[in-house]
Amino acid sequence: MAAAQRWLPGILRRGDGLARRLYSSASSLLFDDTQEQFKESVHKFAQETIAPHAAAIDASNHFPKDVNLWKLMGDFNLHGLTAPEEYGGMGLGYMYHCIAMEEISRASGSVGLSYGAHSNLCINQLVRHGSPAQKLKYLPKLISGEHVGALAMSEPNSGSDVVSMKCKAEKVDGGYVINGNKMWCTNGPSAQTLVVYAKTDIAAGSKGITAFIIEKGMPGFSTAQKLDKLGMRGSDTCELVFENCFVPHENVLGEEGKGVYVMMSGLDLERLVLAAGPIGLMQACLDVAVPYVRQREQFGRPIGEFQFIQGKLADMYTSLQSSRSFVYSVARDCDNGKVDRKDCAGVILFAAERATQVALQAIQCLGGNGYINEYPTGRLLRDAKLFEIGAGTSEIRRMIIGRELFKEE
């Protein structure tokens, strides 16, 4: 504890400034002046508003009770970056969304994951497929941070094979009655608005799935106990329970039987935005490791002077920069209307696996201190691993890329 108290504040303080110097020249190759200014402003906001709570969020497994991070991010206009201005959004592109995801995740992986589920999985689904009435009803409060959003596809026995879901929506007068369960729902315990997929025709396979907008407090809808996760702690995750939950017809998102279209049409962009999360975690690893090896002395000199430590830093740096370049080049293509499924799967596959390795290297650079929870490196490793599993496992991403390449002429 004493060692951490002696080293950690200086490391994080010096690491922040050092990181800005180290990466300013590289980022200028990726961003125009406006995007660079946006990145600096989000960085400052995240470091001042979110980063001070990161360790406590991980330890307590919940967001701070005395600070409403959702509302603060809403006040900073981060939730609706890709949403139309008429609903309170910014009307910007995925370059900006990825920048925000990177910097928030750099400050706290848990907050970054919850932010991504809210702004990307929920808000963007409503933007792309909501009716004018649905957008007017739900988007303003989600964008302001007054309400929290979530999305639920997976079930206890339906993860990667999402089309095999058992949650059923039976058509009745005026709407549908939903019965079943959803699993691993990020933001589930705190969400007021949820996009949920259910089978409206069991015999129709992928053509029998429909997307619904579920509101907290609907009779028959409840959340089970919050899940105790290895990492991304504080980013609330739970099981959703539907017991004869009536959902009015006007809460169908898109059309009946078109749920897979709603799901798949946004999945590529969802993978892209989430891929910026591992970028932020890799940056956070370097924020800690580089200043530490400058200060930590063994054999009479800073350990950063030893070539094997410099080699680790070089590997960490190139993993970060190659991942960052890949993510933002794909984001730029998406903003230009060129959405490539294999590239969107590729960016999160590559960045997620690199982030886990970079976090391991950061722990190794800190040695015994890296294994102590007073330092952030262990948290960064536990957070990074999620991105190899959530939003489609690495194995599924490889399958998507291989399938797309096989189909090409």
Swiss-Prot record:
UniProt-annotated binding residues for substrate? S160, S206, K207, Y261, D268, L269, E270, R271, A391, G392
Protein name (database record) = Isovaleryl-CoA dehydrogenase, mitochondrial
List the SUPFAM superfamilies hit by this protein, alphabetically: Acyl-CoA dehydrogenase C-terminal domain-like, Acyl-CoA dehydrogenase NM domain-like
Residues at the active site: E270 (proton acceptor)
Span of chain positions assigned to the transit peptide in the UniProt entry: 1-22
Annotated catalysed reactions: 3-methylbutanoyl-CoA + oxidized [electron-transfer flavoprotein] + H(+) = 3-methylbut-2-enoyl-CoA + reduced [electron-transfer flavoprotein]
User: In which domain of life is the source organism classified?
Assistant: Eukaryota
Q: What is its EC number?
A: 1.3.8.4
Q: Whose protein is this, by species?
A: Oryza sativa subsp. japonica (Rice)
Q: Which residues form a coiled coil?
A: none
